[in-house]
Each structure stands twice: as C-alpha cells, then as structure tokens.
Amino acid sequence: MARRALDGVLLLDKPVGLSSNDALMRAKRLYQAKKAGHTGTLDPLASGLLPLCFGEATKFSQDLLEADKTYEATMRLGVRTTTGDAEGDVLDTRDVSCDEAAVRAALARFVGEIVQVPPMYSALKRDGKPLYEYARAGQTVEREGRTVTIRALALVSCALPDVTFRVTCSKGTYVRTLAEDIGEALGCGAHLTMLRRTGVGPLTLEHAVTLDALDAATQDERDARLAPVDALLSTFPCVKLDAALATRFLHGQRLKLSELAARPDAAEGGRVRVYDADDRLLGVARASEGVLAPERLVVTGA
C-alpha cells in the first residue's frame, strides 16, 4: 500500500508494556505515513502522552524534547528495589512511620533546582554503552549528579504506604529517582509503582487517543485526530508576513524587523512562529539584533 505524505501531530496515549518506538511503528502503519518520529521516549512501564510527529512536524520534534514534562506517579514507601520501580528485585524493606503531613513536607523540599544521580537502569551511556547493560551484568559505575528543575510537585493521594503525586519537571528528570529520593528523605525508602505522563510542553493528555481506538477507526477518523504542525509551537509568539516578505522568508532570507507590519512580541533572541497572510505556517524564526532570521522552514505549508 502506498505511503502517504502526512503533516501533523498525533497525541497518543501509550499503554503500559509497549516501547515508544513500537508505538510509533504501529501508528505509522495505521496512517500509512511516509515519515514519522516521536518526541522523546516514554519507558515501556510508563503510560500516557506520547506526541508523534508526521511529515513536516518532525522538524520541530526537538522543541518537545527540550520541553517540561508533567507526570502522575505512585510510589510505595518502605521498599527499595534494584531498578527503582516494581520490575526490580527488592533490596530492603523498612517500616513506614511517617504520616501525610510528613509526606507533604518532604515533597515541598524537592521543588526547585535539585541534583539527581541518574539511575543505573537508564539509557544514559558510559563509554558508548548504556548504563542498564552494566546494571544487568551486576556492575555499578560512577555517575555524576545532574541539576534538574522541579517546577511543581503536589500530593494527589496518600494511602500509606502508597503515595500518588503530580510533578512538572525539566528535561532529563528521572521520576523514579525522585521517588527514591523522597523515600530516603522520609527515612523509609521507596520505589515507583505507576508512572503516567499527562503533559509535554503545551500538549496534554486530554485529547490523546489510544492505539486500540485508532485501530478501530476509519482512515478519515484517524486523519481527523491529527493536530496541525503548529500545535507544537503554540507557546511561540506569532508573526505574519505579507506575500512579498513571505516569499523572501521561504527563500531563507533574513528580514529586517522594521519591514514587518507588526514587530514580534518576543524577547531579544526569542523564537517566533511565522505565517503568511492566509495563516499558513511558514516556519520558525529567531528575532535578534533587528532581524528575523529563518530557523526551520515548512516546505508544504502544513
């Protein structure tokens, strides 16, 4: 069957047990798409929002890789495991003597910039080899702490020893490690039992669709699920160009900000999304030093 040149963004609700790449391949087959990519992996043991990019949208997937993420997670206090989640072997168990007030206080301590040591069971590489390969061989290698930012951390429910929380965090944050560190702060240890991603940058789980629902849908129904390419860029200020400026922009020319009908509402050096007079997305540019410099262009005007 012929592949289709599709442009857009699919908000997929990935199930537990499926890798991000397998989810992408299934969606790509269902859409018969020529080109597709995801915006950063979601662990097989995690469920939730996995934005998939088709066609021209793949040019902007890096923006979501850099974006903050929001998760809902459940940790079990009193039990530490080798992997930091329910898949690992139990390392030790301890009594849970804290109450809800202590849990709330512990969560509050982790808001802001924190330093995390990446877990051994992770895809980070050391000497070209993923850390999880060392871990599976029973080896532990030294890892440097990394600074990440916890934007928000709120208690959802507390049914000790199980605690469910919602966290919004910067790129590179390990929620498993966060749960373990909170457990240590409470003096009893912890491991993650559930992880569900509910937000990636400006995108949310609210309008996501499952693979089963896509499988049962008609092609027209599936296509209607695709958000436009600029769904990835909704936080960027908007610039509109007249026909002459749009032509120059699409040829990669830098435009003087003084030539624009309205200056972009962006900080110096800020990125903006650029449209023509018919509201067709032309691409992304950077407004800096009095010029609008094309950064990524949309070929099809998706």
From Swiss-Prot:
| Active site positions, chain numbering | D43
**Family matches, as InterPro entries:** PsdUridine_synth_cat_dom_sf, PsdUridine_synth_N, PUA-like_sf, PUA_sf, tRNA_psdUridine_synth_TruB, tRNA_sdUridine_synth_fam1_C, TruB_C
* Catalytic reaction annotation: uridine(55) in tRNA = pseudouridine(55) in tRNA
Q: What is its EC number?
A: 5.4.99.25
In alphabetical order, the GO MF annotations are: RNA binding; tRNA pseudouridine(55) synthase activity
Q: Name one Pfam family in it.
A: TruB_N
Q: Which UniProt keywords apply?
A: Isomerase, tRNA processing
Q: Which domain of life is it from?
A: Bacteria
Enzyme class, one word?
isomerase
One of the protein's GO biological processes? mRNA pseudouridine synthesis
Q: What does this protein do?
A: Responsible for synthesis of pseudouridine from uracil-55 in the psi GC loop of transfer RNAs.
Q: Which family does it belong to?
A: Belongs to the pseudouridine synthase TruB family. Type 1 subfamily.
PANTHER family assigned to the protein according to its UniProt record, in alphabetical order: PSEUDOURIDYLATE SYNTHASE TRUB1 (PTHR13767:SF2), TRNA-PSEUDOURIDINE SYNTHASE (PTHR13767)
User: Entry's HAMAP family?
Assistant: TruB_bact
Designated name of the protein: tRNA pseudouridine synthase B
What organism does this protein naturally occur in?
Answer: Burkholderia mallei (strain NCTC 10247)
Classification from the root reads: Bacteria, Pseudomonadati, Pseudomonadota, Betaproteobacteria, Burkholderiales
Q: What gene, per UniProt, encodes this protein? A: truB
